[in-house]
């Protein structure tokens, strides 16, 4: 490995709490870690400057990893600039939706959660629990702890397409509605 690649690899490791080049693909399969540890705590724009040039250094950091992270963060301009995919176009949104290893049902729930504002998060979670008659789960003031509880609970959810659409409708958020309708139309959820 030449000097430039060694320096870039070292810079990336110093920026990340985990060695990003070795871990990102595995982290993506563990949703609570990627969203709680990375998106809630890190300066993503700083980290991102080092991830793109590092794509050639390791097969574990792929284009799909970067697109997925940018999509969750609503960084439409960067997706368009680096990957020539306009998230506001239906066909391009379908392409972006394919860049993920997260199961479709779980991904849509996670996307919906991340797209909501701080005020909407508790409403969103409470609606899910109400639908499932499991509202005994109590949320606190710590957003990170709420997220950990939420993601640990996601796999137990048995949400149908109709229930998700009802949740989306009740949030009355145009951006969420448009994004989720595209994803739902692209990939049917199993009831």
UniProtKB/Swiss-Prot annotation:
Cellular-component GO terms for this entry: host cell membrane; membrane
Protein location: Host membrane
Topological type in the membrane: Single-pass membrane protein
A matching Pfam family: Herpes_U15
Keyword Transmembrane helix assigned: yes
InterPro entries: Herpes_U15 (IPR008644)
Main location: host cell
Name recorded for this polypeptide: Protein U15
Species of provenance: Human herpesvirus 6B (strain Z29)
Gene transcribed to yield this protein: U15
């Amino acid at each position: 490995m030449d000097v430039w690649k060694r320096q870039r690899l070292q810079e990336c490791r110093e920026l990340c709490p985990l060695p990003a080049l070795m871990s990102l693909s595995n982290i993506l399969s563990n949703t609570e870690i990627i969203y709680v540890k990375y998106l809630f705590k890190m300066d993503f724009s700083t980290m991102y400057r080092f991830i793109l040039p590092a794509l050639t250094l390791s097969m574990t950091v792929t284009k799909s990893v970067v697109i997925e992270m940018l999509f969750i963060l609503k960084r439409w301009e960067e997706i368009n600039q680096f990957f020539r995919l306009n998230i506001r176009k239906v066909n391009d949104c379908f392409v972006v939706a394919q860049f993920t290893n997260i199961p479709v049902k779980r991904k849509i729930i996670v996307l919906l959660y991340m797209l909501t504002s701080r005020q909407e998060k508790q409403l969103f979670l409470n609606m899910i629990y109400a639908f499932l008659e499991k509202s005994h789960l109590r949320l606190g003031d710590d957003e990170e702890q709420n997220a950990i509880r939420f993601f640990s609970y996601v796999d137990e959810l048995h949400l149908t397409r109709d229930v998700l659409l009802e949740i989306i409708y009740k949030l009355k958020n145009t951006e969420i509605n448009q994004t989720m309708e595209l994803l739902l139309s692209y990939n049917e959820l199993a009831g």
